[in-house]
Amino acid sequence: MKSSFNILLHLALLALPAVGQAQLTCTTNNGALTITGYDGPGGAVSIPAAINGLPVTRIGDKAFGSCTNLTDVTIPNSITSIGQRAFYFCTSLTNVSIGTSVASIGQGGFCYCWSLPRVTIPAGVISIGGAAFYDCTSLTNVTIPTSVTSIGDHAFSFCTHLTSVTIPNCVTNIVW
């Protein structure tokens, strides 16, 4: 049974500057939560690993899309997938920390994040969707871990400052 609800979070974490109150919209299915929306002030946001005792396991499609004031995001180890266009048009995003349990980055997951200079794709990611980092014009280098087997079309297209991409031999499918 799916249900939707809003959760008001106070994100005054020691490791990150206080960002005030951030509102996350979630859905629940089989005892796990998917983040489906964000309506907070931006700045630095640390996505919680659990809310009210339920694990947060997925960032849904367009959940943080067009959050132009978002500058830093920490994705916990509880997250297993990042949905399509989850962070698209987060034009002020300068840092993203992706948890080690993420297995897939959806199509357009971080496209148009013009201020993002670097991204560490953790070991465990199997699939990088098409246009995942499309037009991330500040991105300078990317190392693909050996766990990745598939890279979608245009995953790094129009990353105009990208000077180095390291792709391991285990990648069996690259769509151009």
Feature locations, PLM:
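Consensus positions within tandem repeat domains that build extended binding/scaffold surfaces
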Residues: 61-63, 83-88, 106-112, 129-134, ...
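Structural signature of tandem-repeat unit edges
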Residues: 28-30, 41-58, 68-81, 91-104, ...
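Short beta-strand/loop segment at the start of cytosolic alpha/beta domains
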Residues: 21-37
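Sec-dependent, cleavable N-terminal signal peptides
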Residues: 1-23
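Acidic, Ser/Thr
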Residues: 37-38, 50, 63-64
